[in-house]
Amino acid sequence: AFSHQAGHIQAALYSAGVLEWQERPFLAFHVSGGTTELLLCEKGEIRKIGGTADLTAGQAIDRTGVRLGLRFPCGAELEKLAEGVKPAKARPSVRGLTCHISGLENQTVKMMEEGRSKEEIAAYTIEFIRATLEALTANALELYGRMPVLYAGGVMSCRIIRESMEKKFAGAFAQPEFSSDNACG
């Protein structure tokens, strides 16, 4: 059987031009509105080794965006608001290979109550997700050793997050058009 997760991984490998990774172990992140998972892919097996214990990254982005009056799904508009804004330092909640994203919601509500601008809140939201994914990636590479990292899912089409992860981890990314559901399979 070809799982939903396997479909995202195959589409990501194909669109990133790294199908040959199937021949060796690699890490894969699937980060979207429906899931935020860290997967170990080896010998044709996909095993979940980490991810969120509560909200997904996409849910957090959309909830913040809706609160800011953006159209759902909110990722692209939130990113536009965040462009060129230096975000406040994010303190993601990551233990090992598990993250908690729900705290972001409380922080953005507090920022709104403090009268912070939509742009500042958008930039902080993206920075929180970026910092969370960076910490998870670093922890996974420390635990499993150096190996390629693949990023897929709608949230990974955010240019701010992609550029940071490309620079820090030389990750491969699904093209945005291959990051949606049913991109493969």
Feature annotation, model-predicted:
Residues 2-27:
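Conserved phosphate-binding catalytic cores of ATP/NTP-utilizing and phosphoryl-transfer enzymes
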Residues 1-9, 52, 172-175:
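Short, acidic/small-residue loops that bind anionic groups at enzyme active sites
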Residues 8-13, 175-185:
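Glycine-rich phosphate-binding/hydrolytic loop that grips phosphoryl groups
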Residues 20-24, 29-32, 36-119:
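A short helix-loop
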Residues 79-149, 155-174:
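A contiguous, well-structured pocket-lining segment that forms one wall/lid of small-molecule binding clefts
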Residues 1, 30, 153, 176:
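Small/polar loops that bind or transfer phosphate-bearing groups
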Residues 9, 33, 154:
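Active-site glycine-centered loops adjacent to acidic/histidine catalytic or metal-binding residues
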Residues 11-12, 38-41, 160-162:
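Short glycine-/acidic-enriched loop or helix-start segments at secondary-structure transitions
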